[in-house]
Amino acid sequence: MSRLSAHVEVASILRRAEATGDFATIIKKGDSERGSLLMLVSSRGRHIACLERVLTLNGGYRWQATGPGDSAQSAEVAGFLGKRARFDEDLWAIELDIADPERFIAETISAG
């Protein structure tokens, strides 16, 4: 099953956040075609969740929670991102500050 190029999916995530008046930025740029995606979701500067696009058994992709959980300190989130970036040079990391993070996460996970 094919998927969108990483840079196209990242652009879509940025537009989706900005369309609702939220903040989104790329904090690590990976391979434009095949890079893995990691979203760091916060609300008013408070960390809420990390979401990663993963390959499923049927060959599709979906988003799942990973890394530090709700209200993790910024040092813990930065450490997690640093380890992931060293392990995966193709990684894209997107930081989002969302007014309604629970809704954003639910919509993202359900959309795959």
Predicted segment positions?
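Polybasic/polar functional segments that serve as interface/processing modules
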Residues: 1-112
